[in-house]
Amino acid sequence: MATETKLSQMEEFIRAFLEIDADSNEMIDKQELIKYCQKYRLDMKLIDPWIARFDTDKDNKISIEEFCRGFGLKVSEIRREKDELKKERDGKFPKLPPNIEIIAATMSKTKQYEICCQFKEYVDNTSRTGNDMREVANKMKSLLDNTYGRVWQVVLLTGSYWMNFSHEPFLSIQFKYNNYVCLAWRTPSQ
């Protein structure tokens, strides 16, 4: 049932920045951009507009702060994403319990694990009636808001569903635990 989740254009930009910053100095320069474009056979004409858009201090480099400011992102969240992606590349992330199935997710495996296991714990400690499941949804929203910043949406359901939604970069998940499906995503707080 799990499918490869297509990243949004914003998520692709963030991943590109993190990949271009191979030396992890939180700065990319024109040479690094050229190498990246050559590696992926991208149009070299993209380089100057990228530098013009993000290089606010005109030093021909794009810092992580300039990049985040240009997209309205929080530097701390991009750093966290970078650390979690590195753990994934190194194979250092926890495995989900066998009775949890990821349907779709744009977030790191670490976040997936934390969220899914907490949901499982909440569900396992209830009678699984309507009121208890409403409380699980409330607890999940509170946990997500407090752990990953506001404003999260949480939907719990059984059965089929179709949806289309917008979310903050790398902050959406859809998963199944037993007969429950949990949908969670963070929307902009401003």
Curated annotation (Swiss-Prot):
Ca(2+) binds at D55, D57, D59, K61, E66. One of its GO terms (molecular function) is calcium ion binding. The keyword NAD does not apply. GO terms for biological process: microtubule-based process. Adult and schistosomula tegument. This is Tegument antigen. Residues 8-43, 51-77 form the EF-hand domain. Keywords: Calcium, Metal-binding, Repeat. InterPro entries: DLC_sf, Dynein_light_chain_typ-1/2, EF-hand-dom_pair, EF_Hand_1_Ca_BS, EF_hand_dom. The gene is A12. One of its GO terms (cellular component) is dynein complex. The keyword Ribonucleoprotein does not apply.
